[in-house]
Each structure stands twice: as structure tokens, then as C-alpha cells.
Design a protein with these regions (language model features):
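A structural boundary/capping signal
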Residues: 1-348
Length: 348
């Protein structure tokens, strides 16, 4: 409470990135004012937001007056941050937000809040909007499309129908065949496994995009899980990404369904769907360089990770199709052809 008997209450996201902006998550989700019962009526109120460094457009909120002992929620107004600036970040930037309250020309209160602007490849973890992990599933990247083309060739070489046709067959066999072929394709890329960041599930980590994996080629467990999920979505199937305390792996629906919610923290429910052959999960790190495991062995390993014995480590499963229904879109990646302007790639 300030000496002017006026308090300013804020809800500010502690971290923010292009994924938040792209999917319309507000940086400042609420602003309210309240006056003490013993205060005088305050008139011509304006709340002004500025930032240091100056990376956020100045914003202001107006209120005609505030009676003693009353409060007011200010009209919602989005705080504008340059998408170009957020897309170009390569390191985290700490930003100090300053909210100043004026009555006419008189400054009567100041509140400071901080937020961290993250690089576009940074996921904030389970403690920071876990749904936004779906933004890192990138079905339209060049490497994803390359993988899916190779899946068709692999199916054809095995004497199977080469069409990448999602659930059009109305059987569980064709999705399973596509997933098995995808496993072999990614395994052939000889991607080297690297350790994930400690406690990445709760604190988050940088995620290598598909084209980054192709270039290096290195990947941690979450990178591989999102690479598989990207290709699975590109094939017209519905991927599921599973997160435990120290690991990530992937799965897919064998029928054209999705979970009721974007995230599911009930391993028993997932095991039931697997038992009904509606869902298949597999350990993606076994597709990394040096592993001799086949797809069936990867499936067995995935089911062990979701078993009752491992429940204490399970955090959640992310359903990509349900996320898309909630309009969580992939992070835009801007390509710059030699003779054209920048082009953003995303879900069509």
C-alpha cells in the first residue's frame, strides 16, 4: 500500500517468448487498482507502463476516478512486443517493467515487476505454460518434410503402400506401418544423443528445431521427441509427447482421436488406451546413434517408462491434436529466399 492509499495489483508472466506471443498469451494478464477506505476520491487516473531495456511499446490505462474503499479492474489492453525482436533473441533478456500511476500530472504510485524474455527455442517447462510445448512441434520444417518423403520410400521398399495418408485406411495397421518406417528413417540419420538439461521437465530447456538437428546432428531426449512428433503430425497422425522428471519420449494415436485436454497427468488412463490398441508409445532415444534397437523394442521400452513402477516419475502427456484445436500453433520460422522477402512456415 502506498502513502497515497492506493494500491496497484498486477499479474505479469515471469517469462515470455515468441511462442507466447504467437499463441496470444498475454504478458500482462490483469491490472487492478484499489483505494483505502480512508483515502480521498482519486480522479483522472492513468497507469503507464515502460520497460528497461526499452523493448516493449509504452502502454497506458485510464480510469476517470476511484472512490475510497473501492477497486477497479482496468480495461484489458495487450502489451505489444515486437515479434521480430522476440524471434531474433539468442539469449535470455531480463526486463524490468515499471508501472507508474498518475492522478492528472502527479505521480502517486510506482510498482516494478520483472520478466524474462526467452529465445524462440526456449521452452519454459511444466511450471511455465506446459501447453506451449506443442508450439515446438514443427510439421512444416524442411527436415520434417524430408523425413516424411523418406518414410514413403521406406514403405514402398518394404512392399507396403507408400501413401502417407494419415487415418484414411480406417485401420490401426497403416498408422503402425508409417510409425515403424519413420523410426527406421530417423535411425538412419545417425543422430548423436546428448544429455538434457537438469530438471528440464519443470524448469524447461532450449529445444533443437528439426533443421538444427539435421545440421549438427545432435539431440537430447526432448529434441528427439519433438522431432518424431513433428514428423508424426506431418504424416497426418496425432502425436503425443510424454514427459517424465528426467526424460521425454513420444507416442501416436492409432485411431483418429485425441485426448480431452491438452495435457494428461493420468498414466493409468494412457495405459488403458495402449491396452486397447488406440495409442502406441515408444522410446525415441533408442533411435539415436549407437543403438541397435528396432521399433518393437522401442515400443517395449516406452511402455516400461509408463508402467506402474515408473509412475512416480511421470509428469504429463501432451496431446498435439488437442493443442491445435486450442489454436496452439508452431513457432514461426522465417526463411529468406535469395530473391524474396521472409516467409514464415507453420501449420497450414
Amino acid at each position: 500500500m502506498s502513502k497515497y492509499n492506493l494500491s496497484l495489483n498486477l499479474t505479469v508472466c515471469p517469462f515470455y517468448s515468441i511462442a507466447f506471443l504467437q499463441n496470444q498469451y498475454p504478458l500482462v494478464s490483469s491490472i487492478s487498482l484499489s483505494a483505502n477506505p480512508d483515502s480521498k476520491t482519486i480522479s483522472n487516473i492513468r497507469v503507464v507502463l515502460t520497460a528497461d531495456p526499452d523493448v516493449i511499446h509504452e502502454a497506458s490505462w485510464d480510469l476517470d476516478f476511484l472512490e475510497p474503499g473501492t477497486g477497479s479492474i482496468l480495461l484489458n489492453k495487450s502489451v505489444r512486443i515486437s515479434s521480430e525482436y522476440l524471434s531474433g533473441l539468442t539469449e535470455q533478456v531480463e526486463v524490468l517493467l515499471k508501472f507508474e500511476v498518475f492522478s492528472g500530472d502527479e505521480l502517486i504510485n510506482t510498482v516494478h515487476q520483472s520478466t524474462a524474455l526467452m529465445p524462440k527455442n526456449q521452452w519454459a517447462g511444466f511450471n511455465g505454460m506446459p501447453d506451449l510445448l506443442a508450439a515446438f512441434c514443427m510439421p512444416n520444417s524442411e527436415f520434417t518434410e524430408e523425413l516424411v518423403r523418406s518414410v514413403s520410400e521406406t514403405l514402398s521398399a518394404s512392399g507396403l503402400p507408400p501413401q502417407i495418408d494419415g487415418y484414411q485406411s480406417k485401420t490401426r495397421d497403416k498408422p503402425h506401418q508409417m510409425l515403424s518406417a519413420l523410426w527406421n528413417v530417423i535411425k538412419s540419420k545417425q543422430i548423436s544423443y546428448v544429455n538434457p538439461s537438469p530438471s528440464f521437465a519443470t524448469k524447461g530447456q532450449r529445444i533443437r528445431f528439426p533443421d538444427d538437428i539435421k545440421r549438427t546432428p545432435n539431440a537430447a531426449c526432448l529434441d528427439l521427441a519433438m522431432l518424431f512428433a513433428s514428423a508424426i503430425e506431418r504424416m497426418g497422425l496425432n502425436p503425443v509427447v510424454l514427459i517424465t522428471r528426467e526424460h521425454a519420449f513420444v507416442g501416436a494415436w492409432l485411431i483418429d482421436q485425441c485426448s480431452q485436454f491438452v495435457t494428461n497427468d493420468d498414466p493409468m488412463d494412457l495405459r488403458k488406451k495402449i491396452s486397447n490398441q488406440d495409442l502406441i508409445i515408444f522410446e525415441t532415444t533408442l533411435a539415436a546413434l549407437g543403438s541397435k534397437a528396432n521399433f518393437s523394442q522401442a515400443v517395449d521400452s516406452g511402455e516400461v517408462l509408463l508402467s506402474e513402477d515408473q509412475e512416480k516419475d511421470f509428469i504429463f502427456a501432451l496431446d498435439i491434436k488437442q493443442a491445435r484445436k486450442r489454436e496452439i500453433r508452431p513457432i514461426p520460422i522465417y526463411e529468406k529466399p535469395s530473391d524474396e522477402g521472409a516467409v514464415a512456415t507453420g501449420v497450414e
